[in-house]
């Protein structure tokens, strides 16, 4: 479904990713681990069309995405939940969610928005309690739920999730990760998860990639093949 092949990418003249190749199949979950500064966020931003690509290719559902802007990639069914959540604080929870449905046609909105909203609040009941509240007054965990819910309103087939546990209380991390598990089981949604918490990656994902200094140092082994020693060794390779 998603194929990243020999990607070199970064920001302007600053190259961050070097010859990165990875694959995500329909309904699969893959994780990307690595130390701070390894290029994990840049990888997701590159797939979403938000970085400069110097070489290589990104294919989604058999279509090349080279040169395609981010909004066009989103319209194909590729959703990005960025690090830091990026919700609109002055808008209500409901308004934030409705913005997430922008790629639907007018007929689809009329027919499906109510059902989509129901599915999001079923997944995150706390959002139903805060439906009319401004997003800026939500807790960090509630804002993360809102960011994921907003992405789901576009009916994606692939969702890229960047550091969902960042800055959250343990009970909120458990709720957010539980929701990602539900999405896999109930929606057959393909997920690419960037996360510092190794156990969350191993619990959710079928395969794991490890980045260090912008290069893959461990490429897509199944989670049961990864040992803690192997993960630690990969983190400290020079790349």
Label every PLM stretch briefly:
Residues 174-187:
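Helical segment within the ABC ATPase nucleotide-binding domain
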Residues 12, 68, 93-112, 123-125, ...:
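ABC-type ATPase nucleotide-binding domains, specifically the catalytic core motifs of the NBD
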Residues 56-64, 76, 112-117, 218:
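Conserved ABC transporter NBD signature motif
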Residues 48:
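Helix-to-loop junction immediately C-terminal to a conserved catalytic motif
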Residues 33-35:
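The feature captures the beta-strand-to-loop junction immediately N-terminal to the Walker
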Residues 151-152:
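ABC ATPase C-loop
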